[in-house]
Every structure is written in C-alpha cells, then in structure tokens.
Amino acid sequence: MKVLLIKDVKGLGKAGEIKEVKDGYGNNFLIGKGFAKAATPDVLRQYEAAQKRKAEELKYEIANLEKLKEELAKVTVVVKKTLGANGSLFGSVSKEEIAAELEKTHHLVVEKKAIDLDTHLKAVGLYDVSIKLGHSINATLKVDVQGE
C-alpha cells in the first residue's frame, strides 16, 4: 500500500514523502494515528495544490519582507530620553521604545522581539540597530538617541 506521509515518522520518512508500506501498518498505525493518508490520485492532487499555494504564500511573504527591509534602511528613528546632570541618559533605550517610536512616526510595524540590540543604548548618539525580519532577512535601522 502506498501512503503520503502527513507528519515525519521516525524510521520511515519525512512529511510529504510517498512510501510503500504493508497494509496493516499503513491502515492501522499510520492512517489511524493521522501520520499519513492513502496515496490516491485525488489525495496527491490536493497535496500538490497545497504545496503550490504554500510556495506562493512564501514568495509573497519574502517580497513583503524585502520591501520592509528597504523602507527600514531609509528611516531614522528619533528617541528622546531625559538626561541626567552629567549628560548621560536615565536608563537605556529599550526595544519596546524603538518599536513604538517606529510605528508612531513612520507607520512601520516591527515586533519588539525582532529588534536585536547588541549593546544597551545608554548614551546620546546615532546607532545602527539590527532587525531580524525572518526568512534570513535582516534589516538595519538607524536610531538617533537625543536628550531632553
């Protein structure tokens, strides 16, 4: 019996593979537990259509991330913090503040967990901040920390 694996099965194969198995193993275990479907022409056609749809969605998502990367490269986010008597900042600039200011001033939404601060932004100045957008696409955002 031929089956289309829906999930990875240890010792048999990965999801999406078509395997030849014994009838009892295929019907009772793989199909019964939801690890596979019988490899009928209709099931294979549905699987191929789903794979094409996923590929198109991935292509669209990557194009949107590339567009966002280009937009972020053109933008400088200004974050104003209170200065102490000696000219240093009270605290440091957080990921949340950067994400909020980016959304408020430039209407670009980036999750705070995507912002990668290598060092704490504790002084006034211009910084390059890395943003991990996903699918191995990284953007660089300029952050200008100013005192008030």
Swiss-Prot record:
Q: Does the keyword Acyltransferase apply?
A: no
Recorded GO CC terms: ribonucleoprotein complex; ribosome
Keywords for this protein: Ribonucleoprotein, Ribosomal protein, RNA-binding, rRNA-binding
Q: What GO molecular functions are on record for this protein?
A: rRNA binding; structural constituent of ribosome
Q: What are the BP-aspect GO terms?
A: translation
Q: Does the keyword Transferase apply?
A: no
Q: Which Gene3D superfamilies match?
A: Ribosomal protein L9, C-terminal domain, Ribosomal protein L9, N-terminal domain
| UniProt-listed InterPro entries | Ribosomal_bL9, Ribosomal_bL9/RNase_H1_N, Ribosomal_bL9_bac/chp, Ribosomal_bL9_C, Ribosomal_bL9_C_sf, Ribosomal_bL9_N, Ribosomal_bL9_N_sf
UniProt family annotation: Belongs to the bacterial ribosomal protein bL9 family.
- Function recorded in the entry: Binds to the 23S rRNA.
- Could you tell me which HAMAP family the record lists for this protein? Ribosomal_bL9
Q: What is this protein called?
A: Large ribosomal subunit protein bL9
Origin species: Campylobacter concisus (strain 13826)
